[in-house]
Amino acid sequence: MAKVKTSYVCSQCGYETSKWNGKCPNCGEWNTFEEVELAVRAGGAKSKPTTVRDISDKIVGIDDVDASYNEIRYATGLKELDRVLGGGLVKGSLVLLGGEPGIGKSTMLLQICQYLGQDHTILYVSGEESVRQIKLRANRLHVDSENLYLLADNDCEQICSVIVKEKPEIVIIDSIQTMNISGISSAQGSVTQVRECTNMFMRTAKSEEIPMFIVGHVNKDGAIAGPKVMEHIVDCVLYFEGQRNPVSYTHLTLPTKR
């Protein structure tokens, strides 16, 4: 039988402790700890010994590695975006697109779908809008592609299962703050949910070799809502910034890329 374990996680750096602290000992920020509850196994029964797998056969000499496959990139159709991505989307990469709500993140991603959908299958997953709302917005942007598929859901485990089964060539998650894992008791958008959902999407992207865009909203301080460790989980972080007064414009910045 599972029991509930309570811990505290820093919303800035992801540092976890069993007791609440006013100041995070890892990043030095004040009042950033949030209480989270996790279901853990009761310690009554002894666990079975784990069998260690022999992975020595996976060792490969560096001269024997075929690196040409990793050079395959999907051009997005947006010249500046392709430039900051080093030529386009890499297979198996996870790109975090952050920005204020309403700045145009979803609009830009639908425009990318219009271009990429000519030759590639795309799964657009929304936890914020219904498929009808996405369709109406796509109509306003004149986005029409028979290779674009829509899914309105926020269950991270179910979404990853669909990705593995259907095997789309490109996936868009809009947004990470609306996703959740049922086994975690904390609310959507919490430190634990955002971190673990990001980890799950990353594992799926790598195992299936599918590039993914995930949308992340920024908070009032201009940082992507959720733990800072999320930015270190993904392969690339893009900030979509803009100014409405006196002149309206938007631009992409690339603070992190690995």
Regions found by a protein language model. Give the residues of each.
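Conserved inter-motif catalytic segment of the P-loop NTP-binding fold
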Residues: 92, 100-103, 110-200
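Substrate-engagement module of ASCE P-loop NTPases
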Residues: 193-213
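N-terminal, positively charged regions that mediate nucleic acid binding
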Residues: 21, 212, 237
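Detector for small/aliphatic-rich hydrophobic stretches
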Residues: 5, 16-95, 119-124
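A short helix-turn-beta junction within AAA+ P-loop NTPase domains corresponding to the substrate/partner-engaging
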Residues: 229-239
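Structural recognition of the conserved hydrophobic beta-strand(s) that form the central parallel beta-sheet
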Residues: 172, 211-216
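Cys/His-rich Zn2+-binding cysteine-cluster or related metal-binding knuckle/ribbon modules and their
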Residues: 1-23, 28-37, 41, 176, ...
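Conserved small/polar residues in nucleotide/adenosyl-binding loops
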Residues: 250-256
